[in-house]
Structures are given as C-alpha cells and as structure tokens.
Amino acid sequence: MSKPHSEAGTAFIQTQQLHAAMADTFLEHMCRLDIDSPPITARNTGIICTIGPASRSVETLKEMIKSGMNVARLNFSHGTHEYHAETIKNVRTATESFASDPILYRPVAVALDTKGPEIRTGLIKGSGTAEVELKKGATLKITLDNAYMEKCDENILWLDYKNICKVVEVGSKIYVDDGLISLQVKQKGADFLVTEVENGGSLGSKKGVNLPGAAVDLPAVSEKDIQDLKFGVEQDVDMVFASFIRKASDVHEVRKVLGEKGKNIKIISKIENHEGVRRFDEILEASDGIMVARGDLGIEIPAEKVFLAQKMMIGRCNRAGKPVICATQMLESMIKKPRPTRAEGSDVANAVLDGADCIMLSGETAKGDYPLEAVRMQHLIAREAEAAIYHLQLFEELRRLAPITSDPTEATAVGAVEASFKCCSGAIIVLTKSGRSAHQVARYRPRAPIIAVTRNPQTARQAHLYRGIFPVLCKDPVQEAWAEDVDLRVNFAMNVGKARGFFKKGDVVIVLTGWRPGSGFTNTMRVVPVP
C-alpha cells in the first residue's frame, strides 16, 4: 500500500486518492489525482447484468456473482415466461450456493425489465438468430400483415404497431435497432409503407423501432406488460425496470398492476424519449428510482444531447436521494472483444463520477463472448472512479441541499457521514429493517462502504440499488435482550468487513443503531475501534 496521507491517521482505507481528496478546489483536486494510488477493496457502485443465453447457466451465474454482479436483469422484450422462470431459478440457485458461508454470501436481486410501449420488428425468416443485410438505397416495404410476422427478409419487414401508417408522414424517418438502420418513408398505404434504406446494415429479429417526433399512441402498460408484471409478482422479483415512461400516470399504472401483493417491488422508471426528459420531475416523484436508458434516448433526442440528459437526471436523483442507473452501450465492444475501447472505459468512469448509483450491462452479459470479463472490467473501473470523487465538495452540497428536519434518522445519517470523513472510518455499519436508515446514509455519499445488516432478505437485495450500501443478511435468531441483539448484528458486520478487507483490527468504524426494536428508530451513532 502507498503511505497514508499525514492528516489521515493510520486507517489504510483512506489511501485511495487521499492527497487529491484534501484539495481546496476542484481544479486542484484534479491536478492531484495519481494513477499509482490504489483504490479501496470495496466497490460502492452497483453492477446490473442482463441475463441471456451467454450467462443463464448456474455455473456462469456463480462466476458472475463472484466477479461482482449485484442485480440480475431479465429483459421481457425477449423470451417466454417458462424461459424467464428458469433463469430466475438459476439466479437463485447460484446465489444460494454461497449461503453456507454467511460472511461471503451476497444477496443478488432480480429485476424484471418490461417490454413497455415499444415497437418491434418480426422474426427474420422464422428464426430468432437469422440476419439479413439491408443495402443503402434499397426499397424496403413495411407491412402490418400478420402473414409476414415470422417471415421478414430484406424486401419486407413486419412490425407490431398497428397505427404506424396514421402517425408517420411521407418523408418521416424510421429507426431500427438502436438507430443503426434508418429508413425514410416514400409512400403510405392503409396497412403498409414503402421506405428507402438510408443507412443499411445487418438486421436481426425482434429489433426495436423508433419513430422520433411521431405522436405514438401506445398505452403505457400493454396487455403483455400486465401478464409479465403479474408473473413478476408471482416470482417475487425485487424490482421492475419500467420501459418508456413518459409521465407520472404511467408509473401509477405499473404500480396498480403490481397491486397489494407487489407493493414492496421497487419501480425504476426508464427515461427513453423527449417527453420523459421534459416531465422528469413528476416521474421522479412517482418512482422509486430512474434508469437513464441511453439507447432509445439517443435516437429520440439528438445524440449530442444525451450526456446533458444523463447529467441532469443523475443530478436530480442525487438531490432527491433516489437511486439512478446508467445503462446502454457502457462496454458495448466487449460483446465481441475481451477489452473495452478507451472511450467505454471513460464512459463507465464518468457515469460513476456523475453520481450514478448503478451501472448496467446489456448485450455484454446477455449474448456477448466475454460476460465475466465485462463484469470484472466494470468492477475495476468503478472502484477507481469512486476513489477520484471530490467528496469534500459533494458532501458539502448534499448537506446544504437537504431540508432542515427533526427526523432523528436523517440527522443521525448526516452526522455519521460527516464523522466517517473526519475519522477516516473503514466502514459505516447500519442495522436496518426496512432499509431506510441505510438509504439515508447512502444519500450523503460517504467514502466508506455502508455495511447494512438486515434480517429481511428483500431489504438486503433491494439495497444494491443505492450507491455504497453493502447489504449483509443476518440469519441468526433474534436475541431476547435488545442490547444483545444489537451487539450480535454489529459483530456480524465486523466479521464481514474484516473478511472482505474493508478494514482491519485497530481501524475505526461508525455504528448506527436504534434505541428500540422496529423500523424508524435509528438515532444512535457510535465511533468504534475494530476489535
């Protein structure tokens, strides 16, 4: 390890970029960043992996959990309920295979990503994997005739939006597959369009279609979404990534479908078009969190403006204390190559520096050749980026923005984070039932990991959505005496932290506890040396 900074005492946790962290200005902070300064062992940013053919076997999933996966995402635009039920079973089998060692056990969350009001093409020549080449300048007929649903080729393309002929005009653009293929409408019929291929390429089955500027009148929650969400409730998923959310009422509709049985499922709204960005505040208010879905967003709004939307949304989520996920094309080239491009490395790091709580992999883990390498790469980049955050300014601003409150949990959380900076603590240990105490601490972005001890498995899994929370599940029976039960859980967290290298004997940790059993009573902060 490099030598700790003189002001830092002896806690080894604080060597990462400490010289820079002590800078007085942001520019000085940047000047002091040092590529030879090792980051800490803990990674604070969550990693969400899409599970698909390349990663759904129990063996691969075990390796992905070891490499750092926190949330498994299932994309319901593809696959049947049977297929997804099997994937969920595999994720849980892989997760529970580590259960014999409570110290190394990681609760992995399951996320259901809805198809949402999106438009997709049909199957190419009856196969999910076939592709055809579309040549620039060629004529492509778009049809609504179901006879072609599974018989698309380079001359005719079926898609599943029945009103397309009403909402596009001659001269309109149609984008397919994240905008890789663009078509221009030349002629309109009652149930077909004739288009010219402006930008060609190879087209696969069931690709997404975007109609920028068109007033697409699809319902927020389709019939398929209702079935999928009910399936998710039965399968006990932890969160829903709701696609193409355009306004707050869309979120309420998803909430209504989840119903009483699914009331604890977190709803993360995916912002993927202009209306969603424009009405961001009302959507944030209604949601449990936000996903910056840059794929569709980059077609619906100009590509050069996506970073503005990303920074604005991450900023507002950080201000509101709600989790935000950065997604799409983060390590895209790793689908086919073992190393990312330099631009992708920067992109992952900058998403973390912007303040994202989680970063996501899509095709990289679902269908790529290097799923494990992609997870490891995100893990390494995130850790380095977290060390380079200018906490001095960040904490100051978050604290200033927080409303004055008489809520003991809020006040204790701010105090704990402030104290953790002052004494360079190795971790902040929080005992939490509903997860709220841990979320409050995470909101102030401490440098040290937050070890959240809970007996509620769902609280543990959902905690991965928040930056910095390292959830651990306590399976020991509740002790009769409250004080003994507190000690039991704090010691459990100490053992986890030592085993994982977050801190060692002699370091200090901050411990947050309640004064009586139940939720909502966290009000005590202690500074404790590690035994």
Swiss-Prot record:
Residues modified as S-nitrosocysteine are C423, C424
Q: Which residues carry this modification: Phosphoserine?
A: S37, S97, S100, S127
What cofactors are annotated for this protein? Mg(2+); K(+)
Q: Name one Pfam family in it.
A: PK_C
Q: Cellular component GO terms, alphabetically?
A: cilium; collagen-containing extracellular matrix; cytoplasm; cytosol; extracellular exosome; extracellular region; extracellular vesicle; ficolin-1-rich granule lumen
Which sites bind K(+)? N75, S77, D113, T114
Where, in this chain's numbering, is ATP bound? N75, F76, S77, H78, R120, K207
Instruction: Provide the positions where the record notes the PTM Phosphothreonine.
Output: T41, T195
Write out the residues that bind substrate.
Answer: R73, K270, G295, D296, T328
Enzyme Commission number(s) from the entry:
2.7.1.40, 2.7.11.1, 2.7.10.2
Which amino acid positions bind L-serine, per UniProt? N70, R106, H464
List residues modified as N6-acetyllysine. Answer: K62, K89, K166, K266, K270, K305, K322, K433, K475
Residues with the 4-hydroxyproline modification: P403, P408
Q: Where is this cross-link: Glycyl lysine isopeptide (Lys-Gly) (interchain with G-Cter in SUMO2)?
A: K115, K266, K270
The further comment given in this record reads: There are 4 isozymes of pyruvate kinase in mammals (L, R, M1, M2) encoded by 2 different genes: PKLR and PKM. The L and R isozymes are generated from the PKLR by differential splicing of RNA; the M1 and M2 forms are produced from the PKM gene by differential splicing. L type is major isozyme in the liver, R is found in red cells, M1 is the main form in muscle, heart and brain, and M2 is found in early fetal tissues as well as in most cancer cells.
What is the protein name stated in its UniProt record? Pyruvate kinase PKM
Q: Which organism is it from?
A: Homo sapiens (Human)
Q: What is the lineage of its organism?
A: Eukaryota, Metazoa, Chordata, Craniata, Vertebrata
Q: What gene name does this entry carry?
A: PKM
